[in-house]
């Protein structure tokens, strides 16, 4: 581009003609704008010469109010006719191209800045993507039409514009400060080469992040798995074990590979984008995305593994859609084989899903093929997504991590750590989950149903409901190498053996699962439904008058702003009354008026369903609710007393709810909450004692409601300890105690009308008992029977007096004392039927 009026006229005409058909958008304009210093000259750099790319960039700069690349720009005494250059020099009139040469504009810029130390310039790498698809070496359609790793000629670019021009995306990267490079004092030529090298690496990493790394066709990829040493050995072992020929075993391995592998196609991604755009707009009031900028930065140069929480079947569709819309490659998604249904399974496979069986036990050949497939994806740098919870959470809580996929990932990384792996937690928060009706039945005790293609019609039938908003929060990434450095500092130098199964693998994988779960909870998106559910489920009759309800919600918001749970946690907009109106509009909250005002309440169906939404945020309120519980039975406590009982109970709450604070940070966090309580009038601090308000006061009612949030969890803890103590030393196993707790919790829920199915969730008791063992409170003898410290009873009763009302403690002790006959009958029944 020169200052020639004729050339400017030709370029302007080309741009107008191009945009008769082309539609473009900028992927990350907002984050880019924040990094730009408008006081310094700006130059844009494109990777390869292309007049159409330049026209698109010029259009996007004009739309955003940024300096245009085709206008002159001055740097000191240097006047450049245009503010752009190509990293790869333009060919001469014979089509010859000297790739070793440096862009003349870059050379002149370095000279000008070297001669004038007061001047500076910003270089902004810009990429234009005509479509967004990974390469497939045997797919001429993609090679012709979609942006890939193939070199694009004029004919192919013309076809790309015709076919994919209406889906053109521009990515501006963070500016490179040329002055900073010059200050390294490397000399003119070396500075130019350094700038070129930085730009080449940048473009390569960005292209991998946006369109995906170079990957071979599915058929060749699957066949290639069979040539890997570990799979070859597994085939020979299978042939020997099953008494079949190696050829038959190899054919079986090939069938496994085809069953597993995705068939990632750009056509399917675009089809899903169109369908899902309609779907989201049809049922949701909006999708809020938070903290995506960090992912866009870290995606370049890393193998990204997205680890979302799992609340709905649409989780993976939503995440892939958002990543694609924001210029990142949709991941390959681990899906259960139960989703490989007719029609739906094929579409999911083409959208990036690869299918896995629920269990690998007893099938080493399948295990080997699956592990090798994942290793191939990881080492090629292709993004992957899987759910550490395994299945969808039916209770709204974060489920205990299933560590199988994490272990496979860790072993793959130990085998080859060339591509650094980073886990990106993704919290997906729904105001109304799509499968709510199904979960309602399961929350009431119905068994889990197998997925069917006909389930799609149930979803269509639910589209008339209001589903509110969805929030997608990207949490703090976890770099696997840094995690291993903390857990196993010498992991790089250890001899790991051919299967890459070090002795510390299981324990380290478990801790990695806990870390992922904690980071997921840190990224929680708190919404109006969560807070309304938390408030009303803490009342005796599931009802509050509207003014009291607004006060409770305002209190919760004030506390969360005063003591933020995490930098990645988000809060709803508006005050208590706005939140109430929002939930009423979604038909989740009933209202009744009388002479004194309005009563807000939950009907029977919503009362059960709202436990799901309360549980989404229970981990955030667990610690303040525990502190509030101390003042239900005690009118005053010292800081030392509060800390002592908090330290005693916190490990069990932390383990169950994946609360973020380690024990050595607990005291400081407790102090923050106590200060917030005093500021809000929930406590008074006088004469070195924290004192509760008068029982008849409004503030005491608020303190009591807050304490009820965690009451059922504390009751479960006390019940398990009471049953253990009643059984005596070395008389009951962990499994027997777990079954006994479940039976007794069901009875207690009937006696007290508890409408919370997780109260008698067997897995929660199992985890609590395991935590007692991990903490050294319990021990197993040679027969597997449990023993406990002699002071356990006194300690448990002392803590219970602080957090549970006397009538609840009495009821639990009575149930524990009279459990023998009925519990024995119920536990014996299954054994007699076997």
UniProtKB/Swiss-Prot annotation:
<dbReference type="Pfam" id="PF01553">
    <property type="entry name" value="Acyltransferase"/>
</dbReference>
<keyword id="KW-0594">Phospholipid biosynthesis</keyword>
<dbReference type="InterPro" id="IPR022284">
    <property type="entry name" value="GPAT/DHAPAT"/>
</dbReference>
<dbReference type="Pfam" id="PF19277">
    <property type="entry name" value="GPAT_C"/>
</dbReference>
<keyword id="KW-0444">Lipid biosynthesis</keyword>
<keyword id="KW-1208">Phospholipid metabolism</keyword>
<dbReference type="GO" id="GO:0016024">
    <property type="term" value="P:CDP-diacylglycerol biosynthetic process"/>
</dbReference>
<dbReference type="GO" id="GO:0006631">
    <property type="term" value="P:fatty acid metabolic process"/>
</dbReference>
<comment type="pathway">
    <text>Phospholipid metabolism; CDP-diacylglycerol biosynthesis; CDP-diacylglycerol from sn-glycerol 3-phosphate: step 1/3.</text>
</comment>
<dbReference type="GO" id="GO:0004366">
    <property type="term" value="F:glycerol-3-phosphate O-acyltransferase activity"/>
</dbReference>
<keyword id="KW-0808">Transferase</keyword>
<dbReference type="InterPro" id="IPR045520">
    <property type="entry name" value="GPAT/DHAPAT_C"/>
</dbReference>
<dbReference type="InterPro" id="IPR028354">
    <property type="entry name" value="GPAT_PlsB"/>
</dbReference>
<comment type="similarity">
    <text>Belongs to the GPAT/DAPAT family.</text>
</comment>
<dbReference type="InterPro" id="IPR002123">
    <property type="entry name" value="Plipid/glycerol_acylTrfase"/>
</dbReference>
<keyword id="KW-0472">Membrane</keyword>
<dbReference type="InterPro" id="IPR041728">
    <property type="entry name" value="GPAT/DHAPAT_LPLAT"/>
</dbReference>
<dbReference type="GO" id="GO:0005886">
    <property type="term" value="C:plasma membrane"/>
</dbReference>
<keyword id="KW-0997">Cell inner membrane</keyword>
<protein>
    <recommendedName>
        <fullName>Glycerol-3-phosphate acyltransferase</fullName>
        <ecNumber>2.3.1.15</ecNumber>
    </recommendedName>
</protein>
<feature type="short sequence motif" description="HXXXXD motif">
    <location>
        <begin position="309"/>
        <end position="314"/>
    </location>
</feature>
<keyword id="KW-0012">Acyltransferase</keyword>
<keyword id="KW-0443">Lipid metabolism</keyword>
<keyword id="KW-1003">Cell membrane</keyword>
């Amino acid at each position: 581009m020169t200052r020639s009026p004729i050339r400017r006229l030709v370029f302007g005409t080309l741009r107008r003609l191009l945009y008769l058909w082309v539609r473009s958008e900028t992927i990350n304009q907002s984050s880019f704008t924040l990094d730009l210093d408008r006081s310094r000259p700006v130059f844009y750099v494109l990777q390869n010469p292309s007049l159409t790319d330049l026209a698109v960039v010029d259009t996007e700069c004009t739309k955003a109010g940024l300096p245009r690349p085709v206008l002159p720009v001055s740097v000191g005494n240097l006047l450049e006719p245009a503010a752009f250059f190509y990293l790869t020099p333009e060919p001469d009139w014979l089509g010859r191209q000297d790739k070793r040469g440096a862009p003349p504009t870059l050379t002149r810029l370095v000279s000008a800045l070297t001669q004038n130390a007061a001047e500076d310039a910003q270089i902004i790498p810009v990429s234009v993507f005509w479509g967004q698809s990974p390469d497939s070496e045997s797919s001429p359609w993609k090679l012709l039409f979609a942006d890939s790793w193939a070199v694009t000629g004029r004919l192919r670019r013309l076809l790309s514009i015709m076919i994919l021009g209406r889906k053109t995306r521009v990515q501006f990267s963070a500016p490179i400060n040329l002055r900073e490079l010059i200050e390294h004092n490397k000399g003119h030529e070396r500075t130019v080469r350094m700038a070129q090298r930085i730009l080449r690496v940048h473009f390569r990493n960005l292209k991998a992040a946006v369109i995906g790394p170079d990957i071979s066709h599915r058929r060749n990829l699957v066949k290639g798995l069979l040539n890997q040493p570990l799979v070859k050995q597994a085939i020979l072992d299978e042939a020997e074990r099953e008494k079949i020929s190696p050829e038959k075993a190899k054919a079986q391995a090939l069938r496994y590979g085809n069953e597993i592998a995705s068939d990632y196609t750009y056509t399917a991604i675009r089809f899903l984008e169109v369908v899902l755009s309609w779907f989201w707009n049809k049922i949701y009031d909006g999708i809020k995305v938070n903290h995506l900028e960090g992912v866009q930065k870290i995606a370049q140069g890393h193998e990204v593994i997205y680890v979302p929480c799992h609340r709905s079947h649409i989780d993976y569709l939503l995440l892939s859609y958002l990543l694609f819309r924001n210029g990142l490659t949709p991941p390959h998604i681990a899906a259960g084989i139960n989703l490989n249904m007719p029609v739906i399974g094929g579409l999911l496979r083409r959208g990036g899903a690869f299918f896995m069986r629920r269990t690998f036990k007893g099938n080493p050949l399948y295990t080997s093929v699956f592990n090798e497939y994942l290793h191939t994806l990881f080492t090629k740098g292709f993004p992957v997504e899987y759910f550490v919870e395994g299945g969808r959470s039916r209770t709204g809580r974060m489920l205990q991590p299933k560590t199988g996929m994490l272990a496979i990932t860790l072993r793959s990384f130990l085998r080859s750590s060339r591509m650094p792996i980073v886990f990106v937690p993704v919290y997906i928060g729904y105001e109304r989950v799509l499968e709510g009706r199904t979960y309602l039945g399961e929350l009431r005790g119905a068994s889990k149903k197998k997925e069917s293609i006909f389930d799609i019609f149930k979803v269509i039938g639910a589209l008339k409901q209001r589903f509110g908003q969805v929030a997608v929060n990207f949490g703090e990434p976890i770099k696997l190498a840094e995690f291993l450095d903390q857990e196993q500092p010498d992991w790089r130098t250890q001899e790991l053996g051919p299967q890459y199964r070090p002795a510390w693998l299981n324990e380290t994988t478990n801790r990695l699962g806990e870390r992922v779960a904690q980071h997921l909870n840190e990224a929680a998106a708190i919404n109006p439904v969560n807070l309304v559910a938390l408030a009303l489920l803490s009342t005796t009759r599931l009802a509050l008058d509207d003014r009291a309800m607004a006060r409770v919600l305002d209190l919760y918001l004030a506390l969360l702003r005063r003591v933020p749970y995490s930098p990645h946690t988000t809060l709803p907009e508006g005050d208590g009354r706005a939140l109430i109106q929002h939930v009423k509009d979604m038909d989740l909250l009933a209202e009744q008026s009388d002479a004194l005002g309005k009563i807000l309440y939950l009907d029977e169906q919503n009362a059960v369903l709202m436990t799901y939404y309360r549980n989404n945020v229970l981990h955030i309120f667990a610690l303040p609710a525990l502190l509030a519980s101390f003042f239900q039975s005690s009118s005053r406590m010292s800081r030392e007393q509060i800390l002592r009982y908090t330290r005693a109970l916190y490990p069990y709450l932390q383990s169950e709810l994946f609360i973020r604070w380690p024990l050595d940070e607990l005291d400081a966090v407790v102090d923050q909450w106590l200060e917030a309580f005093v500021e809000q009038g929930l406590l008074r601090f006088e004469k070195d004692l924290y004192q509760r308000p008068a029982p008849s006061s409004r503030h005491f009612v608020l303190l009591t409601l807050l304490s009820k949030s965690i009451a059922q969890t504390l009751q479960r803890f006390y019940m398990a300890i009471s049953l253990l103590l009643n059984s005596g030393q070395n008389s009951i196993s962990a499994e027997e105690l777990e079954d006994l707790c479940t039976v007794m919790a069901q009875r207690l829920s009937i006696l007290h009308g508890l409408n919370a199915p997780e109260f008698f969730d067997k897995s929660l008791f199992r985890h609590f008992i395991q935590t007692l063992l991990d903490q050294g409170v319990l021990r197993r003898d040679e027969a597997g029977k449990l023993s406990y410290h002699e002071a356990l009873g006194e300690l448990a009763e002392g803590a219970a007096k602080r957090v549970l009302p006397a009538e609840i403690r009495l009821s639990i002790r009575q149930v524990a004392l009279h459990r023998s006959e009925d519990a024995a009958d119920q536990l014996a029944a299954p054994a007699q039927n076997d």
